[in-house]
């Protein structure tokens, strides 16, 4: 298709209608992919240690299960690198369809993996491979989803709000994952351990089908279409972004530490801490997290909207400060032993994370020039999964084992918050500015 033909095609497109479709497709897609990815984190603390490492001490088995959990995070930057390349060369839409299919396949296959009792250590090995494939798909998803929505935004003044909707998918996916696990938790302990936990993984195939149908019906973004028409695509965008904007890639990863580390402590490690240390039931923890995610995904677009008013960077630094300090309040409430206060701590735990989530998508994506944006935003975003998100449950378990106090974990969260504040301060703020061409000169 020539540049003239591409221009004519988009002249006939109702931009408002396409924006709605793009936002819906992005949000539904990220919800499905995060359901798939976070379902694993929910189940890890409940059953995987018992099923795949039954001969280990319970604490060691839990840490081994979280090690498999970490494999998915190692794969995410690789997925961002691979799909960032295709997203910046072929298009956002094509890359997003591929990520959805890849993640969906891996998640469905998890439900079929035999336990240690059936095939020995091979069960854990297969789980590692599937978790790696799943991580590659999720790693390539975020950058494309945000760009699909943000690059259809009609004005610069609402970009933070528009870009925040794909972020909605993470708490919404966690909400659905916890609902699915809770729904089947009426089974006896042995039944849930034997086959009940597998059903939510099987059900993911239905959601993938819905997401695929929606994504097939959307147009490519006008920003990428112009790049394609003007023949400005980078030859190797995932490599070029490290040459042209290495600082932004690194700062993006560091800026996410205040969100990634506590986020996985509050949503994954809490199942181990809650059942083993607090003596809480599985259903109690799941119910509290369902309330937590409901509050969380309501707050995301509000925080995104506020970033359009007060500035992306300022809003993000407020969120990082909130996140860094909240850990002490969280573990103080858990330490009271009161069921009501424990429930309150869990229910409120995602509010600081979602305060970061709202402005985060626009803050990161706006930092990269359009022809390298999928690669730069995706790789920077997913590198945080290695340095903060993936190791967080493992580090939290190790800190508690060493110090026997939740406050040790709170200090870890505070350190992550400080790092994120400094990183955000060093990023340029592009709020309300034209992002068709991003200035990559030094500050």
What are these regions (language model features)?
Residues 101-119, 321-337:
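C-terminal ends and interior cores of transmembrane alpha-helices
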């Amino acid at each position: 298709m020539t540049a003239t033909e591409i221009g004519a095609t988009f002249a006939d497109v109702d931009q408002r209608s396409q924006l709605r479709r793009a936002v819906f497709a992005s949000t539904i897609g990220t919800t499905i992919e995060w359901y798939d990815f976070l379902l694993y984190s929910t189940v890890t603390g409940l059953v995987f240690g018992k099923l795949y490492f039954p001969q280990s001490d319970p604490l060691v088995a839990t840490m081994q299960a979280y090690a498999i959990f970490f494999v998915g995070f190692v794969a995410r930057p690789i997925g961002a690198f691979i799909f960032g390349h295709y997203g910046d060369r072929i298009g956002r839409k094509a890359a997003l369809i591929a990520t959805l299919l890849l993640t969906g396949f891996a998640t469905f296959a998890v439900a079929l993996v035999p336990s240690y009792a059936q095939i020995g250590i091979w069960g854990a090995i297969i789980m590692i491979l599937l978790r790696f494939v799943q991580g590659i798909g999720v790693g390539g998803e975020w950058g494309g989803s945000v760009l699909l929505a943000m690059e259809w935004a009609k004005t610069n003044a609402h970009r933070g709000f528009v870009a925040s909707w794909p972020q909605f998918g993470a708490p919404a996916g966690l909400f659905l994952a916890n609902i699915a696990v809770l729904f089947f938790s009426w089974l006896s302990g042995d039944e849930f351990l034997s086959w009940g936990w597998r059903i939510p993984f099987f059900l993911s195939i239905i959601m993938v089908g819905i997401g695929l149908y929606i994504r097939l019906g959307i147009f490519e973004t006008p920003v990428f279409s112009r790049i394609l028409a003007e023949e400005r695509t980078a030859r190797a965008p995932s490599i070029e972004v490290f040459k042209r904007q290495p600082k932004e890639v690194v700062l993006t990863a560091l800026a996410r530490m205040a969100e990634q580390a506590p986020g996985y402590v509050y949503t994954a490690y809490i199942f181990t801490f809650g059942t083993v240390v607090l003596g809480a039931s599985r259903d109690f923890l799941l119910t509290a997290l369902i309330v937590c995610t409901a509050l969380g995904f309501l707050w995301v677009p509000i925080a995104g909207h506020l970033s359009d008013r007060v500035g992306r960077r300022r809003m993000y630094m407020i969120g990082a400060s909130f996140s860094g300090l909240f850990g002490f309040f969280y573990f103080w409430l858990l330490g009271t032993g009161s069921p009501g206060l424990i429930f309150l701590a869990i229910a409120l735990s995602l509010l600081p994370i979602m305060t970061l989530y709202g402005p985060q998508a626009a803050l990161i994506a706006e930092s990269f020039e359009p022809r390298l944006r999928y690669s730069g935003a995706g790789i920077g975003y997913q590198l945080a999964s290695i340095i903060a998100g993936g190791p967080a449950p493992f580090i939290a378990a190790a800190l508690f084992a060493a110090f026997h106090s939740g406050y040790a974990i709170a200090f870890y969260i505070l350190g992550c918050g400080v790092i994120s504040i400094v990183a955000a301060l060093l990023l340029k703020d592009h709020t309300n500015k034209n992002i068709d061409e991003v200035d990559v000169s030094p500050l």
